[in-house]
């Protein structure tokens, strides 16, 4: 969820994956949902050793994955991926939902043939790309008719330190200088799912309405497409003096950060919906 009027929510690195299924032929169908990822989310090179493990905590099952070395803020430049911090696949603990860590091919085969996951490994250490395990989630929705059934899981990333600013490592805004953990963030996301999704629907409609008034229906659709792209690849944090900073990061253009050629074209969105974010872009320039 990326609502610019809620800085905690904007900066929290927890995503919802929502799903809903319904029968189109008016018959009942037996349905199981399967989602997976791998530790590749948390590495820069396929040869990097990784450690993954299953965590069960406060009503949520997690599969956590990250590099063994954890070179925090150790890379810079273009064409690179984060290889510090931890990726998380998370789902509610329930009678019909499960997460599992296990063999990449075996996990899919188990689901395809039986509709279930392999019994989970508690921990998995890899040294090569071909050892990468599956981090899997399933929801046994049972018999599904025309009325449908729905659910959600969560995917998140704790980068530990978000940015080095004038030789000081800084945490992301949502951490509030270490007072909030990634598990706090997941638990809050789980508890607030329904209300946050409703807020997102209202916010989406506001963006569409405002843009249509300004430039017509096609313009509003373009703005809806651009909204997440404009906000993506930014880090929201505070400096040592408590100033709010909101920096963009170029992924494949010299590896620069907070460059004005990105700040200028993105400015209208932030000026319209949260000028504090625009100030966060400009503070370090002036």
List where the protein language model places each region.
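Short helix/strand-bridging catalytic loops that position acidic/His residues to coordinate divalent metals
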Residues: 2-3, 266
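Acidic/polar, glycine-enriched structural segments that form the non-catalytic walls/loops
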Residues: 3-9, 20-258, 275, 279
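Short, solvent-exposed loop/turn segments enriched in Ser/Thr/Gly
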Residues: 11-16
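Carboxylate/His-rich catalytic cores and anion/metal-binding grooves
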Residues: 263-286
């Amino acid at each position: 969820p990326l609502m610019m009027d809620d800085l905690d929510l904007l900066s929290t690195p927890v995503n919802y994956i929502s799903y809903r299924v319904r029968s189109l032929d008016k018959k009942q169908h037996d349905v199981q949902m399967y989602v997976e990822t791998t530790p590749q989310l948390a590495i820069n090179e396929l040869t990097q050793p990784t450690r993954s493990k299953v965590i069960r905590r406060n009503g949520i099952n997690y599969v956590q994955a990250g590099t063994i070395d954890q070179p925090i803020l150790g890379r810079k430049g273009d064409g690179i991926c984060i290889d510090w911090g931890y990726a998380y696949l998370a789902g509610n603990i329930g009678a019909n939902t499960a997460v599992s860590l296990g063999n990449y091919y075996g996990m899919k085969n188990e689901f395809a043939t039986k509709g279930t996951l392999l019994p989970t490994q508690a921990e998995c250490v890899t040294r090569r790309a071909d050892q990468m395990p599956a981090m899997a989630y399933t929801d046994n929705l049972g018999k599904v008719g025309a009325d449908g059934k729905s659910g959600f899981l969560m995917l998140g990333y704790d980068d530990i330190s978000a940015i080095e600013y004038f030789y000081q490592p800084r945490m992301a805004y949502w951490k509030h200088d270490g007072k909030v953990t990634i598990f706090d963030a997941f638990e809050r996301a789980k508890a607030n799912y329904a209300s946050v999704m409703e807020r997102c629907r209202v916010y989406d409609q506001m963006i569409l309405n405002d843009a249509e008034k300004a430039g017509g229906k096609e313009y509003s659709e373009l703005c809806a497409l651009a909204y997440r792209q404009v906000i993506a690849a930014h880090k929201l944090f505070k400096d040592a003096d408590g100033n709010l900073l909101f920096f963009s990061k170029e992924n494949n253009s010299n590896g620069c950060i907070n460059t004005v050629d990105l700040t200028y074209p993105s400015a209208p969105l932030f000026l319209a919906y949260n000028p504090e974010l625009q100030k966060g872009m400009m503070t370090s320039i002036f």
